[in-house]
Amino acid sequence: MVASSFAVLRASRLCQWGWKSWTQLSGPPPLSTGGRTTFARTNATLSLEPGSRSCWDEPLSITVRGLAPEQPVTLRAALRDEKGALFRAHARYRADAGGELDLARAPALGGSFTGLEPMGLIWAMEPERPLWRLVKRDVQKPYVVELEVLDGHEPDGGQRLAQAVHERHFMAPGVRRVPVRDGRVRATLFLPPEPGPFPEIIDLFGVGGGLLEYRASLLAGKGFAVMALAYYNYDDLPKTMETMRIEYFEEAVNYLRGHPEVKGPGIGLLGISKGGELGLAMASFLKGITAAVVINGSVAAVGNTVCYKDETIPPVSLLRDKVKMTKDGLLDVVEALQSPLVDKKSFIPVERSDTTFLFLVGQDDHNWKSEFYAREASKRLQAHGKEKPQIICYPEAGHYIEPPYFPLCSAGMHLLVGANITFGGEPKPHSVAQLDAWQQLQTFFHKQLSGKS
């Protein structure tokens, strides 16, 4: 299907490159000028499948037809986030002998990426504003992606041959979004479109607080009831996280277990970064946590005290002399936390847990030593006769392992540090990690919460 919505294009505020018709640009065949072949306008069309909309974690089929045989072209893609920040990518290609370009078969010859990367125009996007992370704030509205085909291999100089817009949604058709204000609990519950009951998951993000819903909303389209849970800096919750009381998270667990559309009896936890650390603490202190996925989490309390009833876990010490400066002027804090093997009181008591764990680890995580933490958690669990957790490590993947096709955020502001730090990762291997991790965590939760293989 050829995407063709000028109304959406105008609304996206992305169209900065003119308004000539892109659906069918006609002209003479290639001309020979002094031994150099040039390509004039063609009847090029840019086709996307699915056509005008898809979910963010779905792959796109991108095809250009009506080009001249072996015509060199540049494809570029752009989107704006809710704050107006521009993200874009481009790649150079060559049409086949029939004048067709299929990104599933044609390798990129250069640009933001190279090689056979059908989704490279999405995952390789970079922010125009330095150190800016793509974060979806409103899952009820899509990202609008503009794609263009330009003649030649100059990303800003070639004549536009075709253009399309495509909506990337974060809620599959029929997914239900239910705001939750129950006691102290502040959250949003996402339910699949079909009748329940459903296996249930609590989803936790990291430092920065607020309520991020995009991972929960996408997972609800996979058959899970997912509660995106805020725990600070949101609504009437505490503005800081000096003390994390697990009783708050216990309230959230009890709310979800009592919901009429959840299957029970056990709950799944999904947490990244600080959310992974809190997931480990919840699994250690609370009953009914059947399965937990920890994405680049810490096995020690970091930056704040963790409390449950009369127990207190102090944060690990900071080693300020271990902070380094990169050649790009960023702080590297990967060595800046004392080992929980030294600060033993800061080690979260995972040995108390009866939870089945999956650790997803970026081996180039520079936020902290995620692989070390996962392996130390595994050692402690096994030393106490508990089930050996699964650990999946991703070479050259950084800290923020997101749902598929999110661009890598390799550096940015760390609110606890108060400065820009490196988060690690390389774009291509990080994108591979995100795609695999997304499938791994779904398979894990389906098996542990529903008994599906």
Swiss-Prot record:
<dbReference type="InterPro" id="IPR014940">
    <property type="entry name" value="BAAT_C"/>
</dbReference>
<dbReference type="GO" id="GO:0052689">
    <property type="term" value="F:carboxylic ester hydrolase activity"/>
</dbReference>
<dbReference type="GO" id="GO:0009725">
    <property type="term" value="P:response to hormone"/>
</dbReference>
<dbReference type="GO" id="GO:0006631">
    <property type="term" value="P:fatty acid metabolic process"/>
</dbReference>
<dbReference type="Pfam" id="PF08840">
    <property type="entry name" value="BAAT_C"/>
</dbReference>
<keyword id="KW-0809">Transit peptide</keyword>
<dbReference type="GO" id="GO:0070849">
    <property type="term" value="P:response to epidermal growth factor"/>
</dbReference>
<feature type="modified residue" description="N6-succinyllysine">
    <location>
        <position position="447"/>
    </location>
</feature>
<comment type="function">
    <text>Catalyzes the hydrolysis of acyl-CoAs into free fatty acids and coenzyme A (CoASH), regulating their respective intracellular levels. Displays higher activity toward long chain acyl CoAs (C14-C20). The enzyme is involved in enhancing the hepatic fatty acid oxidation in mitochondria.</text>
</comment>
<dbReference type="InterPro" id="IPR006862">
    <property type="entry name" value="Thio_Ohase/aa_AcTrfase"/>
</dbReference>
<dbReference type="GO" id="GO:0001666">
    <property type="term" value="P:response to hypoxia"/>
</dbReference>
<dbReference type="GO" id="GO:0000038">
    <property type="term" value="P:very long-chain fatty acid metabolic process"/>
</dbReference>
<dbReference type="GO" id="GO:0031667">
    <property type="term" value="P:response to nutrient levels"/>
</dbReference>
<comment type="pathway">
    <text>Lipid metabolism; fatty acid metabolism.</text>
</comment>
<feature type="active site" description="Charge relay system">
    <location>
        <position position="365"/>
    </location>
</feature>
<dbReference type="InterPro" id="IPR042490">
    <property type="entry name" value="Thio_Ohase/BAAT_N"/>
</dbReference>
<dbReference type="GO" id="GO:0005739">
    <property type="term" value="C:mitochondrion"/>
</dbReference>
<protein>
    <recommendedName>
        <fullName>Acyl-coenzyme A thioesterase 2, mitochondrial</fullName>
        <ecNumber>3.1.2.2</ecNumber>
    </recommendedName>
</protein>
<dbReference type="GO" id="GO:0047617">
    <property type="term" value="F:fatty acyl-CoA hydrolase activity"/>
</dbReference>
<keyword id="KW-0276">Fatty acid metabolism</keyword>
<feature type="modified residue" description="N6-acetyllysine">
    <location>
        <position position="83"/>
    </location>
</feature>
<comment type="similarity">
    <text>Belongs to the C/M/P thioester hydrolase family.</text>
</comment>
<dbReference type="InterPro" id="IPR016662">
    <property type="entry name" value="Acyl-CoA_thioEstase_long-chain"/>
</dbReference>
<comment type="subunit">
    <text>Monomer.</text>
</comment>
<feature type="active site" description="Charge relay system">
    <location>
        <position position="273"/>
    </location>
</feature>
<dbReference type="InterPro" id="IPR029058">
    <property type="entry name" value="AB_hydrolase_fold"/>
</dbReference>
<feature type="active site" description="Charge relay system">
    <location>
        <position position="399"/>
    </location>
</feature>
<dbReference type="GO" id="GO:0001676">
    <property type="term" value="P:long-chain fatty acid metabolic process"/>
</dbReference>
<keyword id="KW-0496">Mitochondrion</keyword>
<keyword id="KW-0007">Acetylation</keyword>
<dbReference type="GO" id="GO:0006637">
    <property type="term" value="P:acyl-CoA metabolic process"/>
</dbReference>
<dbReference type="GO" id="GO:0036116">
    <property type="term" value="P:long-chain fatty-acyl-CoA catabolic process"/>
</dbReference>
<feature type="transit peptide" description="Mitochondrion">
    <location>
        <begin position="1"/>
        <end position="42"/>
    </location>
</feature>
<dbReference type="Pfam" id="PF04775">
    <property type="entry name" value="Bile_Hydr_Trans"/>
</dbReference>
<keyword id="KW-0378">Hydrolase</keyword>
<dbReference type="GO" id="GO:0052816">
    <property type="term" value="F:long-chain fatty acyl-CoA hydrolase activity"/>
</dbReference>
<dbReference type="GO" id="GO:0009410">
    <property type="term" value="P:response to xenobiotic stimulus"/>
</dbReference>
<dbReference type="GO" id="GO:0005759">
    <property type="term" value="C:mitochondrial matrix"/>
</dbReference>
<keyword id="KW-0719">Serine esterase</keyword>
<keyword id="KW-0443">Lipid metabolism</keyword>
